[in-house]
Design a protein with these regions (language model features):
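A cross-family "folded-core" feature that marks the main globular domain of proteins
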Residues: 2-479
Length: 479
């Protein structure tokens, strides 16, 4: 069993049923390969949730609970690990221990002796990407050395998806961990147990009274803080923090060391907030972000009405993005992959607008950050379209009571950018001569004939508006 088998089961657990043709196309496997995968999985699944082919569908009744139980049954003696998985697990172990004997450590993966050597290129690529060094200690094993802050940040990214936040901000294992992630979570939670409690207390008593972090930001902070406290206990302090001084940060004074606090403050500033007081003022960056905002506002069709909110959101995003890109503090997000194709002009415009900031802070924004910035701007474009575009003036001609028409009006308001200056009875159509309007709406045939007889243009729709009615109204340039 390997990672593909688990991915296949996870997809079926999410969707219950999958057409055979789609499965072959989605996973790039032949039907015979998929059948072998199903057979392998069924050996560890209860019979009532077996995978089976039903005509042209692959189906199962497995739920999340059965899926979690299945993963607990998958041990390394039945799971073929990849080099990337083994290296990620070892990378965490090298952070949690001063020296690790790789040959001994790899025995848990049930692989051949030569696998350790074969995995070396993958390990070198990982550590060199974070400016770290794997030092050989004769007759003992290997030691991970290099910039202490970079080391912690890199290892946090390997741990993050394996844990969740439990009660009282305490980290616990993710319930549906695959074998490698389960191994990583177990060693982290075991080795850092006292520090996890200490980190939760620091967050509750020192940090949360000042800011409110979103779930993912809070989880990252708790992982980093637990790891930092564990490393500090073993004598691995951050001895130099000049690399963390490229932006002004708010000081939380969590740890008893200036260098440690400087790096922790920077890390917190990069995270996702649900409530962020304006504590991240960097005078130099403010000037550059103002220029960036002006560039973005110059794009045709954009009018920003609430410039304070606009600047604050762009500033906070760029501030965090600089830190995240410098230290690789972000994950890929498939939902953002299509942004460049959908909005190519905006993509190019955003790239140009942030170029000056990238150059001056010696970083390069990832595609994920560029896509996010495009969506922030599109959000303001949609918001401000409601402010900028004149509302369509609609008058409803009806003999119905106000209470009944009130519902109809609210449905229209929820779907269209309109104003309804009046609702008039058919017997009052003479008033239309004195009213300014763009469109008349009615929902009865009787009133339609009266309006037609009076030579007035109108649209007749159903009181219970249908999709066809919405289409008809959009044809009247209601948006």
């Amino acid at each position: 069993m390997n990672y593909f088998d688990l991915s296949f089961l996870k997809y079926l657990q999410d969707n219950n049923s999958l057409p055979v043709e789609e499965a072959v196309r989605r996973f790039g496997k032949t039907l015979s390969t998929l059948k072998r995968t199903m057979k392998e999985l069924n050996e560890l699944l209860p019979e009532n949730v077996h995978l089976y082919q039903d005509n042209q569908f692959i189906t199962t009744r497995i739920g999340y609970s059965e899926y979690r139980q299945f993963l607990q049954r998958v041990q390394f003696n039945r799971y073929i690990t990849t080099a990337e998985e083994r290296v990620k697990d070892l990378f965490v172990a090298l952070c949690l221990h001063d020296v690790v004997n790789k040959n001994e450590y790899y025995k848990k993966f049930y692989v051949s002796a030569g696998t350790v050597k074969n995995d070396n290129p993958v390990m070198m690529q990982l550590i060199q990407g974070h400016d770290l060094v794997l030092q050989s200690i004769p007759r003992k094993g290997s030691r991970l050395t290099g910039d202490e802050f970079q080391l912690r940040v890199a290892v946090c990214m390997s741990i993050l998806k394996t844990v969740e936040i439990g009660a009282d901000h305490l980290l616990i294992a993710h319930q549906a961990n695959e074998p490698i992630n389960r191994s990583i979570a177990e060693q982290f939670l075991r080795e850092c147990s006292p520090e996890i409690k200490q980190a939760a207390a620091y967050y509750e008593n020192v940090i949360s009274p000042v800011i409110t972090l979103g779930y993912n930001g809070r989880k990252y902070l708790l992982v980093y803080l637990s790891l930092a406290l564990h490393r500090i206990r073993r004598g691995h302090w951050i001895k130099e923090s000049t690399a963390a001084q490229f932006l002004t940060t708010f000081s939380y004074d969590v740890l008893p060391d200036a260098h440690e606090n400087a790096c922790l403050n920077l890390l917190i500033a990069s995270l996702t907030f649900t409530h962020r007081p304006f504590t991240l003022y960097d005078a130099r960056l403010v000037l550059y972000v103002k220029r960036t905002c002006c560039d973005l506002e110059g794009y045709p069709g954009i009018t920003i009405h609430n410039k304070d909110a606009w600047f604050t959101e762009i500033y906070n995003f760029i501030y965090a993005a600089i830190i995240q890109n410098k230290f690789h503090l972000w994950f890929d997000d498939k939902k953002l992959h299509d942004v460049r194709r959908r909005y190519p002009e905006w993509w190019a415009y955003v790239q140009h607008a942030v170029k000056e900031i990238e150059d001056n802070w010696q970083t390069s924004f990832s595609a994920i950050h560029l896509a996010t910035l495009v969506l922030i701007i599109k959000k303001y474009e949609l918001k401000n379209r409601v402010v900028s575009d004149p509302k369509k003036r609609v008058i409803i001609v009806t003999n119905s009571s106000e209470s009944k028409v009130g519902y109809f009006k609210e449905v229209l308001f929820s779907r269209f950018h309109i104003d309804i200056p009046a609702c008039i009875n058919i017997n009052e159509i003479a008033q239309l001569q004195h009213l300014d309007f763009d469109l008349l709406i009615t929902f009865t045939n009787k009133i339609s004939s009266h309006l037609r007889y009076a030579g007035l243009n109108y649209v007749k729709v159903n009181f219970w508006l249908t999709q066809e009615d919405f289409r008809l109204l959009r044809e009247q340039r209601m948006w």
